[in-house]
Amino acid sequence: PEIGDDGSWKVVVAGDAKLIRMTINMMDYTYQIEKINFNEYIYEIGNESGWSTAHALRGLNFDGKYQGYYWMDGEYKFKPNADNWDGDWENDGEGKIADNGGSNMPGLAAGFYQIDVNLADMTYAATLVESISIIGSANGNWDTDTDLTYNQATGAWEVTTTLNAGEMKFRMNHDWAISWGGANGDGTNYGDLTQNNGANLQVAAGTYLVQLYIQHEGANKVVLTAQ
């Protein structure tokens, strides 16, 4: 890099990448430059909100793969910006999208969905979330699920239940393919849940209103209110 008189760095990177990620290691004074061609977020908008609210899908790895979880009902589209329609993506055949001025995505039956978009190959998928449940020693054992019910008014998956002192996680469709626990290996981190190897959540014995809010990585949380 070029180092200025004030100690600042200037790095010139060839190419036409949309974004640049620079990682600096101050222990050994090295740096790494990564060219990134995808934004961190894209957005879904559709009939479920009267086409008025954009729902964020997050791409944590900047590889063009985005995911989010939302209540859906009817037709919808994807777009790169929350506040305008520039460059929005439409239906381009089953499971495919394109910026072609085409029609909306086919309507979905009302329900809560896992939405996946891959801009690298211009595909998408909407997977119905049939259930989200509590499982763990706090729930009796790791073989028994207690189902939550989605509440459209609060935007949360909810249940009032009695829990033992112990550990628990939340999982989708009674399966371990997708589950949520505490981010950063922290079992007390109720305010930031991850589906990427989340820690078992620690819970004290009691009866609680459990409210689980699932949107995307960095925006998932659970609120336990003692009853």
What do the PLM-derived regions correspond to, one by one?
Residues 1-227:
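Insoluble glucan recognition modules
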